[in-house]
Each structure stands twice: as C-alpha cells, then as structure tokens.
Amino acid sequence: MTPFETFWPETFRHAKQHSPFYREQFRDISDAPRLEELQTVDKTILSARNSDFLSVPRERIAEIVTTSGTTGKPLLWMLTESDVDRLALNEQISFECAGVTPRDTVLVAVSLDRCFIAGLAYWQGLRKLGCTVVRVGASSAMLVLEMIERVRPTVIVGVPSFLRVIADKAAELKFDLKNCPVKKAVCIGEPIRDVKFVLNKSGQAIEAAWGAKVYSTYGVTELANSLCECDAGMGGHLHDQQLHLEILDDAGKPVAPGETGEVVATTFGVEAMPLIRYRTGDCAAMLYEPCRCGRTSPRLGPIIGRKNQKLKLKGTSLFPSTLQAVLEECVGVESFAIVARAENELSDSVEVLYHGDAAVAGLGEAMQARAKILPKIRHASREEIEALQLPSRDGGARKRRTFVDLR
C-alpha cells in the first residue's frame, strides 16, 4: 500500500468524527472517498471558522502558535502533545535530508517567541536528532557572531535576509566568517533558488560570505510540516507519511507532472487541527522522478509566487517574483518595493520603487529582457521603501515584504 492508502482513511474518519467543520462537510459521506471528490478549503475559510477546525478537547492542547500574518490576520493554530512529536519527527527527517547529524552543533538564529512555529519546530527536531542546539534567536547579528566564536557551530538555521545582515556585520568587524566552522546554512522563510533550481542573488551571497552550502526549505504553519532539499538542491523532499500534496490548476484540476500550479495539502497524523485539501496559495511544481541523492520521494520545487499575487500587465501574466529577481540581480539596487494597484478588469497597474544608485533606464532594460514588460519605475528614499515593506511595527505581519498588493 502507498502511504496515502495507509493514512487517508484514518485522517478522514478522525476529521469527520471530531472536527465541527468537517463533520458538517462530510455529513452525507460514510467512507473515505476519492480525495479529488472533496471540496478544497483555503485561508479565507480557516479565518472565518478557525475554531471549528479544532478536533480535540481544549484541555489536550499543548501548544498554540499563530501564522505569520503576511497575507492577513494571523490564525490561531493548536497542537496536542502528539502533534508536537509529529512536528519534531518532521524536522528531524528534514535536517537529516540536509546531511545534519547528531555530531553537529546547530545555531538556531530564528525567533522562538511571538507564537512562531518555526523556532519551536527546529528546536524540537534538532533535539530529537541528537544535535547540540544553540537557540541564539534573530534579534542581534552581534550576538550570533559572538556565539559562533564561543561555541563554534557547524550548522546555522536562519532567514536568508538575516544571514546576510550577519555577514555584513562580520565584514564590518573584520570577522573571518568564511573560515568559521559553519558549513551548512538551512534557509527558511525566503526563497534562495529560482524556478530552474539555480541559486538566486540571496543564496549566492550567503554561500560566498559564509563559505557554507545553503539548503532551501518550505513550510506552512497550518500544516505543521516542512520540506528540505538534499545536497542535490533539486526540491524539498516530501514526507509522505505526514503529508499528501496535490498541484492544481486554476480550475481545481491536477496539472501534469512538473507543471506549475497551486500547492494543495492534506495532513496525516494530526490530532488537533487536521486539514484536508488545503489550498496553501503557493504556486510550485512537483517532481516525481528519483533524486540524485537516491531518495525516491516526490519533491516540491521552488515557490514561484502566491496565486493571489499573480499580476496582469499589458496582456501578460506574471508573478512578482519575476520582477523581484531582476531587482535583486541589478547592481546598485539597495532596497525595493513593487506596488500593484487595480487599473481595470484586464490589467493591473504596477510601480517599482527602488533605492540606490542604479539607473532607471538600466532597470527598465533588464525588466523588458526578463519579464517582457516595462512597469513604472521610480527612485525613492530608503524611508519610503521601508514604510512600504514594514507597514506595521506593532503586531501584524512579521516578515519584510517587497511586494505590496493594493488591488
């Protein structure tokens, strides 16, 4: 039997019996049906009926986390003790995929506060793997450098933009980061590869500054699951005993293997808040051929964008990530924001604001060459761009955004 055939019937039974939302959805269905016969759910439904997805008594909840709030109000997400164990096992498998072993000392440069699931997950998974774990957090580049000098970690986990901040601080202090013991950088929360699996500017900068190999990951709070790539760097390996993924087109139909569509997930083994056919809103492709590392599990390719962020511009559809890649590669662009507004039913209005000494004409040529379109481009102050990237400093979104959707 396949993992899906093994775990799907129990997932369906548990959700139907214990989740108010799924009890209502499945009231006319007795046995586990074909998955594609069921309706999908998205974050709008989760937000409107958050508590109706709880499938255990409240006293069994061991942890409460929240989503990042990047695309809306943060959701409350709950885990039982068993769910936390599942989370730890998932991360153990992911770190093993990246070649991390019990002999490694791992610096976790990720927040463990503000109800953030990732820091909790990495700490639990690394402990389960048997590593020495240093929870340094993400508040101070100087502290990270001090701990690198004192504990000599071999692996670091962090958001790519923060790893670059650390590298800049090291250069300022003439700290020899490239020859420090860190040989692996597990990157979370931001892309480091393009759709062709080539390292983007951020990934290249981290490898150059740290002298370490970078590993891309993909995770979603609501799934309490993440995927990590192996040394081949050709997609995150799926843990198919914990998660089933579909890739669907705009009509909700499966795309052909290797084609891009929306990532739709069904969780296995979750007690508190199981999800069935959850539309993540992320767009990517699945690869099914065996990996060069020898694993035969399916792999999820780089996320090319959010489905609801797709832009329509002068008869062309594209994701903001295409423009972001151009801006990241242009010498002289220090920071930027892409602002989308509704123009009419057939087209959006897109304005690119950047700070730095790059020429507007050069940026325009690069965008026409890569994206086949020429949006409005304007030089802006660092403060104006910062205000767009971080609109709220009190609560709300935790991530710096470079795409601002005002449609």
Task: Mark where each language-model region is.
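Short, well-ordered alpha-helical scaffold segments within catalytic/effector domains
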Residues: D85-Q92, G119, A141, L145
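Conserved AMP-binding loop of ANL adenylate-forming enzymes
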Residues: Q92, E96-G125, L129
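Active-site glycine/GP-rich loop and adjacent strand/helix microenvironment
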Residues: T2-R13, L129-R407
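Hydrophobic alpha-helical segments that mediate membrane insertion or helix-helix packing
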Residues: T67-S68, V106, L126, L245
